Structure formats: C-alpha cells, structure tokens
Amino acid sequence: MSLPKQSVFPGVLTGAWNEALQKIRSQNSVARLWAKDASWWPAEKHHVPIIESNLRWLDLPEQIETLIAHAVQRAAAARKDGFDHLVFVSMGSSTLANAASVSLSDPSIQQHLHLLDSVDPDAVRRLEAKLPLERTLFIFASKSGKRIETHALLLYFLGKLRTAGIAAPGKHFVAFTEEGSYLASLAKDS
C-alpha cells in the first residue's frame, strides 16, 4: 500500500520553501537524522550529547517489541501484587503519552487510572482522597529525571505510604526515565 503524496502550498514563501528543501537535500539531512548525526544541528560542543540523547527515539522501531513485552510483564506482576489503581505522575511534555493512555483506556478501568501533572496542593489532595494507597501503583515519567515537581511528588507519596504503615513502599513506584538519570538512580536504590 502506498501513501498519497502530501501537497504543500507555500504561497508567498515559495522561494524560501524551495531554498530550505534544497538545503535539506544537499546536506543529506534525512540520512544524517537517522544516523543521529548531532553535527547537523548548529550547537555548542557541550550540547552534542544532549542532541544525541534526544534522538534516541529513532531506535524505537527496533526496541518496541522488547519494551512492550517488559511493560506487559510488569503489568502482570503489578496485578499479582494486588495493585488495582494506577497513577501516572509526570510534568510537561512527559504528560502527553500518559494522558493518551488514560483517555484511550477501556472505560471500565478508567476510574482506577489517574493522571497527576500538577503540584497544586488541592489537586494532589483531591487525588489522594480517591486512592487506596495500599493498592496503588505510581508510575513516574520524566525524560531527564531531574524535574523538581516529579521528585517532590515522589517524596510526598513515599511519605504517605510510610505513614500508612505500608511495608516495602518502594514497590509502589515505577520510573520511566533516561538511563543514568537521577530518577533512575533513585528507582534502583529503592
């Protein structure tokens, strides 16, 4: 099956459009993007590792089966451990996939899925009032693993689990973040 060719009508920008297309072609931009060539972006040398890190999404087609298998395995383990409430905790752009997961989920389980993307005390307390903490799994998503808001919410709910006398409160947390990030090291220590 072939996809229809997309049409672009740049109007008064036709000259600039054609110039940009020529530049992209002459610099072999598509191949360089797939090769994760950080030199394609004009940047300071110290930004190169950041650019390379941000291009790792290009590896997803090769990794997706393994990632899905791991997620299914983790979900089965969570159900076996008695978790029946799930809170996605994230800030900024990390929230987008979580919001989609909640909104696209089966309506019969939506009452047990929650999205927390705010540190507003009233919002946090309203959510907390709905949760049976002993049966709640918190999934923290942060690309960099450095967001102060995410860390504050992790510490808040960890404290709540400890205050409730829940054994092994670290088992109530899952982290999706970059390898080697602060959040990843915190998850490994738990």
Tell me what each language-model feature is.
Residues 1-79:
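Extended, charge-enriched "interface" segments that sit outside catalytic cores
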Residues 76, 80-190:
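Glycine-rich phosphate-binding loops that contact phosphosugars or nucleotide phosphates
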